[in-house]
Amino acid sequence: MASVTFDHVTKKFGDVIAVNDLSIHIEDKEFLVLVGPSGCGKSTALRCLAGLEEVTEGRILIGDQVVNDVAPKDRDIAMVFQSYALYPHMSVFDNMAFGLKLRKTPKDEIKRRVDEAAKILNIEHLLDRKPRQLSGGQRQRVAVGRAIVRHPKVFLFDEPLSNLDAKLRVETRASLSRLHQQLGTTFIYVTHDQVEAMTMASRIAVIKDGILQQIDTPQHLYDYPDNIFVAGFIGSPSMNFFNAHLRADDGKLYVDLGNFRVQVSEGHPEAYRAYVNKPVIFGIRPEDIHDPDFAPPGIEAQPVEGMVDVTELMGNEVFVYVQSGEHTFIARVDPRTRFKMGSKGLFSFNMKNMHLFDKDTEKAIR
């Protein structure tokens, strides 16, 4: 097993910078997820680690070894792609064993490793089948099994769940989390899906335009985003953002949004004071906007009037799309709510969980 380090890694394709001065240290046995929109450079970073792309600048280390000039086959890593890439004419057993056979591993050792991986993945009963006889989820497990039998130092996953339906993605996420615990190996996982990142990662690295925006635990990333991009990318529905001004009145601070204002929580950061009478971006998550009749006790609620545009019943909650003057926002409320399309109502903003961002830099004010 091994740690992985990106040390000021840059990757260029001509004049295009795909990865820009990336520095991340991934601990041994960690489950790190690289997340970001399509084209942000996350898969390129993974391919550089795998040796499928040459690094333009910087170093990549696996353990204490710099691997920039090490051939992919000698890096002791295993990669699982979005495409399962199974040999259609081979059985599941032979697909899983193929890499070991190329390395001239003894037959009894091959059987032991394949049987061990099949047991972990619960595909023992599929070893004699051909890929065409398998479901999408089963094929994905075979592809993972082919990686497991190699006993690599590091597992790389490049959007492995993209071809699965929604129900199967949920099941496979849980399976991969269990697999990580069982194997105790370093996992590095690339996805554009923030739900996958939040549910599986021990840490998440958010990337935009080839630049690392923030790296932290899922909960801390969610609660304390460093900038507007991270705040909007992590969470579903995403955070509501409003153009606003910070005002001071009788010793208290208010977020002034034109047609309404809300009082800032008493325990606000001292840094807010420097932004009085300046334009800011006010952010609040949908789950921090409540129907007052069903708001949790003890929250620091500020009432805001709005017109209900659309409601979406999700079963255990309702997404309410609201128009308030020139502002629109989404509230994530109790399913017992009486809000209906076209109705007016009051919404409680839990200001204890508000966020403020610098309008020019888009960085969080703390």
Predicted regions, residues:
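The feature captures the beta-strand-to-loop junction immediately N-terminal to the Walker
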Residues: V35-P37
